[in-house]
Amino acid sequence: MFVPACGGTRPMPTLEEYSFGTAEFVEELRENFFEGKKEEGVGAMESATAAPLRELGERWRGACGNRCSSAVRIIDLQKKSSSDLTVRVEFRLQGWAREDSPERVAANVFFDLSLFRRRTPESFPDGRWQLRSALAVNGPAVIQRGVPHLFEEAASRGLVAPHEPLDPVESTNLCLPATHHHPGVLLVDVDGDGFIDVIVPNRHPRLFLNDGTGHFRDATAGSGLDLLPEMEASGGVAADVDGDGLADLFLSNHISPCRLLKNLGNGKFRDVTQEWGLAGLSGPFTSAVFFDADRDGRVDLFVASYGDARVTGPVYDGRNGGGDRFFRNVERNGHPFFVDETAASGLGDVGWGLAAGACDADDDGDDDLYVANDFGKNGFFENRSTFGHPFFVNIARTNGTEDEGYGMGVAWGDYDGDGRWDLHVSDYWTPYRWILNDSRWPMPPLPGVGLVRPYMGKMMRRRSGGDALFRNLGGLKFARTSEAAGVADGGWAWGAEFVDLDGKGREDLLVVNGMFRATTGVDDEISFWNAMGREGVNFHDGVWGGIDFGVNGMASRTPKRLFWNRGDGTFEERAFVEGFDTLEDTRGLAYADLDGDGAPEVVLSCFRGPLHLYRNAWGEGGGRVVVRLSADHGLNRDALGAVVRLRVNGRVQLREVRAGSSYLSQSSHDLLFGLGGAKAADVIEVRWPDGRRDTLHDVPAGTLVTLVEGRKEKRDFLRR
């Protein structure tokens, strides 16, 4: 796609032009070494300089016997001269070991390729690139092998709810997220039968009730959701707000008023938006969080707000969003009533908010709040509330979590097993960061723009550096470990969660990604980046409104990420070999034990695509414990903010009951633990929201523990 250049009509640079023609050359390398094609004139294919590529190609063809595929992309380029440069490339290989085998094989391999060209009549008269050397960046390539443990079964289990997008042409819509940023998904026990149900925010929200085996029926008709007017509901959050033991529902909207619905039981809801104090809550709202901000026993509400791209763009720093909102639950006339205390609480940030997650990050008994903002800096809001007086202070700049970028998802977990909460922020990683170093990268036609070009390029490279993993050092200090841990490249990332998929007692990390698919099959992310230099001049017309969503795609059909926890502070990406292989443009991600075996299933929502449900086959064997909590007084019956520590074989695992995380989504309130092969958990310690504690000993593997605060626990067997 061509878009107008700043100040003129000249076509902007293409990938081939930015790469000085090397993009075509590395494609030829891929075809020769990994597809078995022999191209004329590529040069040096049989020489010693190509030996590392040739050796990998031979190994790959020996490992992959069926449906083998390969892809390559340039992720960095260093130019020495017009005829001498180095490119760093990633080869992504995947396929099946044999036609008659479920075993999959995959490899992601990085090479630094030194390239040159000469324009002499005697040697390479066409001036084509030649390979001087190929150096594997991380040593010899490892070819992964594995039989999948995740199986996509949404349709066969009755979970069918096509996404209902708005008009695909952004220029006709009111704000950017209403068209391309949703939907999310909520996993919550709606009808109180102990089985996790599914709510899908949508133009017409949907409810799917679980029959207890992980199969679902569409129960939308007659639920009260069917009485709601058409909306842009993209996300939501569910928790027991009124203390009756049933999960109430909040739906966030971008244009229409947000909705709050009381759970009447038996899968029925009633709209209480006005009655409970939230009438007229309209704006470009995204993710929401229920939590008890001031420890008064009532569930409060935080809603992140985006911005309206038609009015003004984020102006590089993204400090002109709609303004996040905080509502304190004061209880009135015997039912919840929400009062806007945004200003007094300190939670009225004006970034372009997309995601939020509450967590007691400093283990002081109250939940802090992290907010991920698009186009700028994120916020870490330390909770300094007193009883009845919510108050937060943004300490992101001083505690190491500001993470300037394009924040799109929030996940809390303890990935290194040290008993402290770590933080993952989904962000934007692009393989095209290197074009921002190029003098041809377009800038707006402003006086003195040449002076700020180095600053602009540096800022944009910093913002597009990928996901942020922050290790908790204690004392509310964090260190970014994304690159060292191997999780920076999440693609154009959205939903994310820490979850122990394989039951080994370590939290893995799931990240979903993708923007939108083209009707032509053309991915035109380069044009997006060509336009981003004008972000602060006119974002809607100059950047987003200049993209024809009906024709050209962007960062679409990208592999999702399953970062398997090695147990040494690093992760191995294993999505394809484990079966987490959808190429849909995914948004929301949530997990829950849907079939009662203790293992987490994963549900994804997709932009212009179907729901996905991944059944977990690692659950077979019973080596898990599930903890289900209920407070015995006050309105916070779901025990939001309760923290559970499970100790087994000298190691500690950490979980917290939350409502709202990932991106526009919510995972189950049940807390899932893997015992790593142990026969029992040695100790389970529960710290309730009011500070009281309970301790359980010798809890066998394969147990569902239901614990009401202050009472003896009930133990049931998980399904095997």
Regions found by a protein language model. Name each.
Residues 195-202, 249-253, 301-305, 368-373, ...:
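Hydrophobic beta-strand segments that make up the repeating blades of beta-propeller
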Residues 201-211:
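Beta-propeller domains
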Residues 552-561, 565-566, 570-720:
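Gly/Ser/Thr/Pro-enriched helix-cap/hinge segments flanking short amphipathic alpha-helices
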Residues 87, 401-434, 457-520, 584-622:
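Repeat-solenoid scaffold signature
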